[in-house]
């Protein structure tokens, strides 16, 4: 059955059957089933031998809803929407209402909120301050470090560069997320290591067993392009003469460790997980290509699902368990370019990776968390009919009579222009004259700048497995790392004892609540 046939079938199923099936009995029956499931659910309080964290970069609640509809209609569910526990995370930074990915990843993976665009350091490090970032008292250790400290194997896979903003706080400490390689660092930062070097030279990076993603230009000096992988002009290029991929290899040889290095689909398929303990997969000079135009042949790049499955096959050999972080990073990239169709497809592929994972694990002993780092400026609006194409036209404006799409952006780049000049007047462009379902179509935006910007809204967190019920309310984003540490009994020193009280005594907690109450009263 073709995709078009499936979409048409779903559309007519909804239209024809809605009158007869979706009556009062239908909705009350659904509610009864959900209630029974909730009442019969039992909390899992086993120790989490394994932890898997999925991060959909820029995956806002509207992105999730739109992707659900895009995939299979309004009543369908993405992989994580079957998880029993859900919470809300506040994403603001210490110094910004709307965050970036490096600061939010530091909160998610290190349990400490910090300044905009810094990596793995606390708020005592201003953006770009190399000297401050060298103070180890300001370093924020991550869940990767905690897992390694208790003997677990660790890994991460991403569709972005392995040195990019979201994965970097797993292993690096930097005053600027842009310092991925030495050419991106100013003269005043020469005393600091670039992020790529920290991945290869320092702990915990050098002991991460599985690393997969893009970013060859950051790892290898004077990297060259190919037919399937041209030079990424958006990314920096290493030029210090070093080949960190080769240095990673030499480190593993010197420690007599079994390893493999792969750079395309056919090489990844040949990996024998039984014989390999360390795997480095760098599949692109910059980010891995968007799924809609990714080369799938032998010399092409693997999907997020394929990388995730390969990572699990290696990590699951560990008798003491593992921690794996998986980032669907191109959801964010698509949104920044104002291409909603690309963002929705990347979200569906993110769901595919989670579906594949759930078939390989036992949730009695594995905690799975799915969340996002921040929202985006895409909005889902208008009054389109049930069963409409989510990428199509919603209706005509009652003011200017011109149609508008169901998905739009509040901010966007030059390609997201909503108005054109006609007879010395500004006139809104009619999107119905274009193919709004195309992957290259740019939805209209209200404010035009260099690109579509992040949103400052809350994100959702979904969980299943040991202690998943600890996600139950509105939480600070930094709470996620604490739950992981508690569920896996990793006991990082920063949190004190394992009772959940950590360093906060009753008097301190009372004082914090009192101060909050006082400030709220004064502001009224």
Stretch-by-stretch model annotation:
Residues 1-18, 508-522:
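Cleavable N-terminal signal peptides of Sec/SRP-targeted secreted and luminal proteins
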Residues 53-54, 156, 370:
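Structural beta-sheet core signal
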Residues 47-72, 135-151:
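Active-site-adjacent structural elements in enzyme catalytic domains
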Residues 120-137:
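His/Cys-centered metal/cofactor-coordination and adjacent catalytic loops
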């Amino acid at each position: 059955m073709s995709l078009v046939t499936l979409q048409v079938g779903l559309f007519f199923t909804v239209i024809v059957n809605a009158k007869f099936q979706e009556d009062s009995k239908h909705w009350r029956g659904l509610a009864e089933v959900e209630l029974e499931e909730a009442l019969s659910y039992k909390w899992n309080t086993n120790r989490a031998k394994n932890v898997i964290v999925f991060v959909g970069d820029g995956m806002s609640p509207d992105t999730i809803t739109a992707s659900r509809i895009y995939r299979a209609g309004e009543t369908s569910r993405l992989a994580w929407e079957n998880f029993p526990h859900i919470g809300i995370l506040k994403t603001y930074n210490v110094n910004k209402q709307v965050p970036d990915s490096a600061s939010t990843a530091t909160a998610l993976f290190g349990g400490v909120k910090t300044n905009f665009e810094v990596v793995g350091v606390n708020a005592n490090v201003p953006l770009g301050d190399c000297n401050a970032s060298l103070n180890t008292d300001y370093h924020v250790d991550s869940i990767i470090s905690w897992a390694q400290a208790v003997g677990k194997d660790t890994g991460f896979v991403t569709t972005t560069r392995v040195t990019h903003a979201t994965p970097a706080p797993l292993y690096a400490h930097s005053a600027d997320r842009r310092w991925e390689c030495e050419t991106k660092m100013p003269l005043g930062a020469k005393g600091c290591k670039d992020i790529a070097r920290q991945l290869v030279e320092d702990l915990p990076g050098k002991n991460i067993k599985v690393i997969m993603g893009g970013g060859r230009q950051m790892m290898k000096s004077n990297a060259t392009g190919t037919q399937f992988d041209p030079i990424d002009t958006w990314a920096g290029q290493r030029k210090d003469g070093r080949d960190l991929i080769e240095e990673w290899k030499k480190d593993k040889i010197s420690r007599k460790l079994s390893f493999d290095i792969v750079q395309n689909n056919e090489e990844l398929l040949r990996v024998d997980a039984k014989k390999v303990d360390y795997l480095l997969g760098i599949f692109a000079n910059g980010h891995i290509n968007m799924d809609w135009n990714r080369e799938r042949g032998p010399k092409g790049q693997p999907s997020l699902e394929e990388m995730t499955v390969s990572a699990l096959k290696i990590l699951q050999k560990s008798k003491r368990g593992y921690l794996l972080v998986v980032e669907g990073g191109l959801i964010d990239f698509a949104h920044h370019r104002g291409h909603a169709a690309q963002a929705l497809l990347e979200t569906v592929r993110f769901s595919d990776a989670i579906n594949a994972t759930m078939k390989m694990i036992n949730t009695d002993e594995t905690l799975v968390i799915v969340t996002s780092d921040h929202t985006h400026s895409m909005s889902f609006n208008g009054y389109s009919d049930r069963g409409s194409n989510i990428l199509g036209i919603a209706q005509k404006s009652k003011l200017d009579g011109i149609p508008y799409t169901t998905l739009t952006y509040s901010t966007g780049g030059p390609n997201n222009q909503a108005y054109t000049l006609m007879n010395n007047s500004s006139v809104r462009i009619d999107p119905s004259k274009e193919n709004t379902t195309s992957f290259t179509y740019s939805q209209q935006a209200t404010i035009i700048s260099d690109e579509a910007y992040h949103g400052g809204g809350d994100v959702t967190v979904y969980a299943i497995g040991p202690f998943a019920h600890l996600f139950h309310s509105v939480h600070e984003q930094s709470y996620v790392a604490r739950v992981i540490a508690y569920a896996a009994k990793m006991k990082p020193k920063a949190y004190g004892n394992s009772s959940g009280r950590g360093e906060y005594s009753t008097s301190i907690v009372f004082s914090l609540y009192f101060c909050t109450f006082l400030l709220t009263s004064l502001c009224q």
